[in-house]
Amino acid sequence: MDGVHYLSIAENGYVQFEQAFFPLYPLIIQFISRIANTSYALSALIISNASFFVGLLVFYRLAKLTDRAKPLRAVILLLVFPTSFFFAATYTESLYFLFATVVIFATKKHRFVLAGILGFLASLTRLFGVFLLVISGYEYIKVYGYRIHARHMLSLLLIPLGLVAYMIYLQYAVGDPIAFIHAQPAFGAGRTGGTIVLPPQVLWRYGKILTTVVPDSPVWAVAFFELTAFLFGMWVLYRGWRAGWDASYLFYSGAVLVVPALTGTLSSVPRYMLCAIPLFLILSSFSSRKFYFVYALVSISVFIMGAALYLQGYFVG
């Protein structure tokens, strides 16, 4: 489980291959543990749960600002999503969710300085953070056109600098600025260490698994879940495109889905979808009650099974 590595980094610093995990979450764990004199594990849980609570409040306000989104429905859809139990675990999902939601909310309010600062923290937490620049940059262009507003433009350029800062550290520490990519194969799941695999190849691989592995095998079940989540996410974005949602929302959420697939696998995509915040706003705009009934029934069932397996120590994403 990733949480073990975050706790190890917080306590001992990076060891071989752990560069795959971005640094801000373990740094905050270490800081909280020292000032509060608590264990690293407890500090991590406090950070995750507090971040998610605050992030959820901001998410609700963001939904209220968004045309066509239904705020309460969006919150419920997020809470019952099959992998949402990770928000309470020692993973970066909660911290990233908080930062990314504030970035999008601040962008909608045209508070670009705040968006830039939180975007910097987001890209120091997860690779997806750099794609927030698309949302903020798109809104900047809608407000200012191509005119230069120095303070706001420079603020938005902070967003990718979180990733840049980590890459500079990696170059200094291990001589490889993209060690977070090259270390991926060490953690299994069939990821490549830098070779790009096109999505059609990945889908073909999953098709072969589902047609050659016996259906009662755990491998088949995991592959089916990962593929279904990916296709569901892409379908929601297609519906959003047809409905005329902001192109920046669609691009960002699409990047969250597609970029992991470029490593040759859809492993963890169901969990990464929690980072695709606009996806849940789009979901909340659907009008079919039958769809929401089926969504809730399936999501809650998978949530219960996934959480039970996770609590027993199984890797479920």
Regions found by a protein language model. Give the residues of each.
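Loop-to-helix entry region of an early transmembrane alpha helix in multi-pass inner-membrane enzymes
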Residues: 23, 27, 35-57, 86, ...
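Specific aromatic-rich, kink-prone transmembrane helix
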Residues: 58, 77-80, 95-114, 133, ...
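Short acidic/glycine- and proline-prone juxtamembrane loop motifs at membrane-interface regions
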Residues: 89-95, 269
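Membrane-lumen/periplasm interface segments of specific transmembrane helices
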Residues: 133-142, 146-239, 245-253, 306
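Membrane-interface transmembrane helices that cradle and orient dolichyl/undecaprenyl
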Residues: 69, 103-114, 141-144, 287
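Transmembrane-helix signature of polytopic, membrane-embedded enzymes
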Residues: 39-43, 59-80, 114, 244-251
